[in-house]
Amino acid sequence: MGVVYKEKNIMRLIPMFLREICVYFNEKKQFLRDAHNKFSHEIVHGSYKDYVDAFKKHRVTYSEYMYSYEYWHLNEEERDEFISTSEMQVIYRKLGNKKVREIFHDKVQFLNAFSPFIHRWWSLAKNISYEEFKRIVLQFDVIAKPIDGTRGKGIFKISSSEDKDWKELYYQLVGDDYLLEQCILETDELKEFHPASLNTIRVVTISCGDHCEVFGALFRMGTHGSIIDNTHAGGIFAPINVETGIIDFPAIDGRNNYYSVHPDTGKQIKGFCIPKWEKIVVTCKEASRTIPNIYFAGWDVCINSNGQVEIIEGNHAPDFDGGMQAPLKKGVKRKIQQTIIDVMGKDPLKLISIWKY
């Protein structure tokens, strides 16, 4: 029976290994093609040859090589202190939980699973009548999100003050399978940074059983009137000291520009203390214990006008590697390694070492 059990385990591992090989070579093809185009058409630092070497050893994207971590001027010892997004994805696939991934990926499942931390109205457009839709949008502003959307794409705001054909809009939202959420009124302390967007706090947790550690946190702000605060929409972000809740460093955008004050409003970023920080930490730790096996999570939260900590969304594979490393230009690979060992009892670097071609 022992031999049969071993064979079954081997068979179960083969598809995962083959999948990882496919992922690696797909990344290699895409990343090297993109980098070659960039080096051919832009005035850049480093060289394509050096980038290829960095990819083989660390699986970095062109953006990580050129901007996020500035690999182009680091020696190999310094480069090895950073962990790339692709390396983190290997760790997530190996150590993450499939059921948790499904819940975090599905916006409706997520809102239901974490309802104790959700204080706003929400519904799928198809689950309410036109009459109810019209009553709601005339009562408060609504954010419309594509049910399968990511990175803020396709999101728009429905304002009760707008002159619209509400019936046409309703059937468009139903047909396109949109999720509707009440616009959150944010506390003035955070709203003042950029009033047009909901300026959120990303808190990254690593958990196993009742043991939960806050690995890092960011404060994200919109810019130029955008309703979205992430970097894909031009937003900026600043690292938060998880012990104090204070922003100790300037914010950064996706092109390595730094901001001690907000570029639009002039509000001071560096030195700002996030309100209700201890409550935010407690909320995220409680959320990480709501369902079993949430080993990794990025919690997007805000402080509403009633002083409540509200969870907006969650990410089962948070980009904390870039978020924590990029602003400081300091690698956190060893910190990630030690935290996962302390919390989960597993060495994540052993999982990615086989990809060092």
Enumerate the predicted regions with their spans.
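Active-site nucleotide/adenylate-binding loops and adjacent lid/helix of ATP-dependent enzymes
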Residues: 90-201, 206-210
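Beta-strand scaffold of nucleotide-dependent catalytic cores
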Residues: 193, 199-206, 212-220, 228-230, ...
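Conserved N-proximal alpha/beta basic substrate-recognition cap immediately N-terminal to
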Residues: 20-136, 284
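A long amphipathic alpha-helix within ATP-dependent nucleotide-binding catalytic cores
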Residues: 184, 188-194, 223-304
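Intrinsically disordered, low-structural-confidence terminal and linker regions
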Residues: 1-27
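Hydrophobic residues embedded in beta-strands of well-ordered beta-sheets
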Residues: 211-212, 245-247, 308-309
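C-terminal active-site "lid" helix and adjoining low-complexity regulatory extension at the edge
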Residues: 8, 257-279, 285, 289-294, ...
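Short, solvent-exposed loop/turn segments at secondary-structure junctions
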Residues: 148-150, 185-186, 210, 220-222, ...
